[in-house]
Amino acid sequence: MNEKALRVRYQKNKVKKERWKMYDVIIIGAGVSGAAAARELSRYNAKVCVIEKEEDVCCGTSKANSAIVHAGYDAKEGSLMAKLNVRGNALMEQLSKDLDFPFKRIGSLVVCKDEEDMPNLKALYDRGVVNGVPGLRILSKEEVHEMEPNLEDDICAALYAPSAGIVCPFNLNIALAENANVNGVEFKFDTEVTDLKKSGDIWEVHTNQGVFETKYVVNAAGVYADKFHNMVSEKKIHITPRRGDYCLLDKSAGSHVSHTVFALPGKYGKGILISPTVHGNLLLGPTAIDIEDKEGTNTTREGLDQVIAGANLNVKNIPMRQVITSFAGLRAHEDGHEFIIEEVADAKGFIDCAGIESPGLTSSPAIGEMVADLLKEKMHLEEKKDFIATRKGVLNPNTLSKEERAALIKEKPEYENIICRCEMITEGEIIDAIRRPLGAKSLDGVKRRTRAGMGRCQAGFCSPRTMEILARERGVNQSEITKSGGNSKIIVGINKDSL
């Protein structure tokens, strides 16, 4: 029997084997909302599975965004978006300690360039007060320029929100998923949902890897959430992918501003921001372009020009020669501009977690709570006595004292071998990223967990060495290693037998 026939037989057997797998809850999507819901549900005695069409967690909206923990003044008063934003912000600091991911509460500024716009700034302040945002103040021209000397001279005032912060979206998403997995949640990657059917009280989730049965479905599919909602409900929703372009600057530019700087919000969002990142870079963006393509994450010349022009309106002397990469992400914009987190009225057992755009990252811990509370009430779930609430991230030797680092290297010499020179990432960190729960399987998976390849050379130096480690640890040929799963292979084949 040839290789193709064997592969077909294997897939048929796999589908047959998986067909009658039964869960209490299946979550569609391993982005930050799905992972947060999974982590909260892992507190209870329920059989939970997360199904993800990509090869890893954090491969959609959650991987390409502004990485801002918003204060909560922008969302409409009384909206679910406002409530979960403020709650998520309040939860983030303790969560970062429990799950060991980087978070900094640096504060944000919404700047005003014209006295005629002061009523709009005051309205934003008033909305924030109603939403329960702590510590809001309107700063004078002198105060704001003392706080941020690189602001443009014509800025006359600013709304200061000290509770705003910055986070690493990769580490947040990965930490939530890892902790959920350690507490018993299953994750199925490279598994694409193709259909949803109801048989009595049981949902059948049809995928390219088989059929899974569950009592409840949580639809946390990002820009695809409308697709799955509309499969099961007569009341349709529509989600527009809203593309945002970004520029990322080298760490040498990271101190150009010390707060997140916003323009006054407009129809399409919060405008072009300028912000330091938790890792010391400077981030500019995003644009807000509505598109049809749910995979349309290509950058455009026009979009990047808009990012640069928008950033330069509010901050002077931005060292644009220090741009090391650009990227684009998609926001899941629902027509009503509101989070939809509820059981679908005409599809019992189907829970929407849809329309999760900004401030979705900030809100994710609160979204997880809300989804779990909905299901806890319906399923009468009992809390586990052995729930593990904490998690340790990939060890960074640079955070250790000289004595601690020496002891670590003596025990594990791989922590002395620098693989990524730009970010000073060691072989030991990469091995940890691969071996840990839900470990990295691709170059991008390693990058999200360790930052190997995120520095000035953008993996130009370290990618071959990272591929060697991935191949060795996974027991495969280097030609099987991908950039980001699927068909994104880097090596087509060996062109000389001697190699």
Predicted segments with their positions:
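N-terminal Rossmann-like FAD-binding beta1-loop-alpha1 element of flavoenzymes
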Residues: 24-50
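C-terminal catalytic lobe of FAD-dependent flavoproteins
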Residues: 269, 278-279, 290, 295-418, ...
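Short beta-strand to alpha-helix junction loop
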Residues: 83-86, 111-120, 159-178, 297-302, ...
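Iron-sulfur (Fe-S) cluster-binding segments and ferredoxin-like electron-carrier domains
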Residues: 295, 426-437, 460-478
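Dinucleotide-binding Rossmann-like beta1-alpha1 core, especially the glycine-rich loop
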Residues: 67-147, 271-272
